[in-house]
Amino acid sequence: MEEADRILIHSLRQAGTAVPPEVQTLRAFTTELVVEAVVRCLRVINPDVGSGLSHLLPPAMSARFRLAMSLAQACMDLGYPLELGYQNFLYPSEPDLRDLLLFLAERLPSDASEDADQPAGDSAIFLRAIGSQIRDQLALPWVPPLLRTPKVQRLQGSALQQPFHSSRLVLPELNSSGELWEFQASPLLLPAPTQVPQLQGRAASLLEHHASQLCQHVNRDCPGDEDRVRWASRVPSQEDSRAPQQRLHKQLIEHLRQSWGPLGAPTQVRDLGEMLQTWGARAMTGVPKGSRFTHSEKFTFHLEPQVQAAQVADVPATSQRLEQDTRAAQEQELESLREQLASVNHNIEEVEADMKTLGINLVQVETECRQSELSVAEQEQALRLKSRTVELLPDGAANLAKLQLVVESSAQRLIHLASQWEKHRVPLLAEYRHLRRLQDCRELESSRRLAEIQELHHSVRAAAEEARRKEEVYKQLVSELETLPKDVSRLAYTQRILEIVGNIRKQKEEITKILSDTKELQKEINSLSGKLDRTFAVTDELVFKDAKKDDAVRKAYKYLAALHENCSQLIQTIEDTGTIMREVRDLEEQIETEMGKKTLSNLEKICEDYRALRQENAGLLGRVREA
């Protein structure tokens, strides 16, 4: 344990605890050093909790109790599994202190010495970021594409793609207010969304029309580009050459770059706000109320939704009628099928009810048939007996004499069989009793051996548990060794760990040897006990036969019985002595454990703290009286 204490003290020094060089074991820890070590570890593990605790033990007893209770609560919040109170800090014992400091040392963060070996620079940081992102993505569960939500499909690029189908839209030119008014007042043209019958092609058509308007805006000031403008204002065809397309594509990209500029420029937002303000002002300071143009504009815009609604309603009227007829036919067919299904279900229910009643009747008929068969059999038996009796009635005296002879012969036969049974029963009974005695002896021997085997199993289990515990300690020490910083010299720790492992192996070999010796000794004891019992039984039987005839043999028999009794007492005394020696060893171990807990020193500290607490209370009472 001294090496484990040294490793633990080294960890506490790394956490910032000022452990004196002369302190080499936890037994030498004082109350002040215990409080400082726990507070330093708490500050490293959880700075929010440890920053509010003082690593110096206050002189006042009440403050000491409060600090000890705060430390106990902080350790319990970290998940300390054992019971913890102020006494573990003010009056510590070595085993409890070792468990507490081991618990805190396990939760100390390891040094990031591995980061020092990694390369620095932007490329290394970028590669580490890529690696962390890949690890995070690999940690997520994989979901098949068909089971993903639409949002996830759009984000991961697994959504179903729609082909780009555009249609030509007929819209007014924006450079003439008269043409716009005529277009909106025309009853022959539908709105832009309703001009495309397919829902998937509306967005594509609007984008295509917007691209053509953008091309016209770009090329209206360039001479000689009328062909390109005319090409951009219609749907692209296969016979157009690639060169104008590439030139127009470059012009669009250049125009977008010049017009939009850097992303998030505040000038565009300002221009948009000014434009909205000018439109709002223009709407507020518009034409006077009573002008003829205002009335005609209102009349036009009020009529336009009705005209468009009529146009939209006329187009799908025929399709709606066809759908209504189809639905009516389907509903009629469905209604007839439902009626047929209801009638079939009703017939099935009637048949099932008839089957249930017939089944009940069948069970009743079968029961009656079985009862009638039983009664018929009984009547046949009675009839057979009566017929035999009637046959014997004509010659009654002779038949009675014959019957008497048959009865007497049967009685003689029973007596003969009983005598034969007695002849066979006596030796069988003696053999049974002998076998029963042998079985009892075997059961006693087997129970004794079973008790011995259970004791051996218990000892083996205890040894295996001890070996398993030492293996766990070994693994824990190896893991702690791996978590130590790289700059610390590991040679001494490695050698000491190898020595500990060697000692554990030696102890394991010694335990195995002791167990084997115990087994052999137990076998020898059992064999000797069996020999002794058998020898005594044979001697007892031989001497007992001659003890009735000879007085000397009778005295020898008495001496033999006394010797056997004395040997039994001697064996029992030896077993009691061994039990007492084991209890003495257990008591010595308990005394050593109690000595390690420093009970006397803790009692002296408690008495001193009690006196100091009484003095503080007396001083406080004096202050209260003076006040």
Curated annotation (Swiss-Prot):
**Classification via InterPro entries:** CCDC22, CCDC22_CC, CCDC22_N
User: Region annotation Sufficient for interaction with COMMD1: residue ranges?
Assistant: 1-321
Q: Which GO terms describe its cellular component?
A: centrosome; endosome
| Cellular location(s) | Endosome; Cytoplasm, Cytoskeleton, Microtubule organizing center, Centrosome
- Give the main location: other
This protein's superkingdom? Eukaryota
Q: Which UniProt keywords apply?
A: Coiled coil, Cytoplasm, Cytoskeleton, Endosome, Phosphoprotein, Protein transport, Transport, Ubl conjugation pathway
Q: Does the keyword Protein transport apply?
A: yes
User: What residue ranges carry the coiled-coil annotation?
Assistant: 448-535
> Where does the record place the modification Phosphoserine?
S410
Q: Where is this region: Sufficicient and required for interaction with CCDC93?
A: 1-447
Give the GO biological process terms. Answer: cholesterol homeostasis; endocytic recycling; Golgi to plasma membrane transport; intracellular copper ion homeostasis; negative regulation of canonical NF-kappaB signal transduction; positive regulation of canonical NF-kappaB signal transduction; positive regulation of ubiquitin-dependent protein catabolic process; protein transport
Give the transmembrane ranges. Answer: none
From the UniProt record, which GO molecular function terms apply? cullin family protein binding
In which family does this protein belong, per the annotation?
Belongs to the CCDC22 family.
Subunit comment: Component of the commander complex consisting of the CCC subcomplex and the retriever subcomplex. Component of the CCC (COMMD/CCDC22/CCDC93) subcomplex consisting of COMMD1, COMMD2, COMMD3, COMMD4, COMMD5, COMMD6, COMMD7, COMMD8, COMMD9, COMMD10, CCDC22 and CCDC93. Forms a coiled-coil heterodimer with CCDC22; this heterodimer interacts with the guanine nucleotide exchange factor DENND10; the interaction is direct. Interacts with CUL1, CUL2, CUL3, SKP1, BTRC. Interacts with SNX17 and SNX31. Interacts with CPNE1 and CPNE4.
What this protein is reported to do is described as: Component of the commander complex that is essential for endosomal recycling of transmembrane cargos; the Commander complex is composed of composed of the CCC subcomplex and the retriever subcomplex. Component of the CCC complex, which is involved in the regulation of endosomal recycling of surface proteins, including integrins, signaling receptor and channels. Involved in regulation of NF-kappa-B signaling.
Q: What is this protein called?
A: Coiled-coil domain-containing protein 22
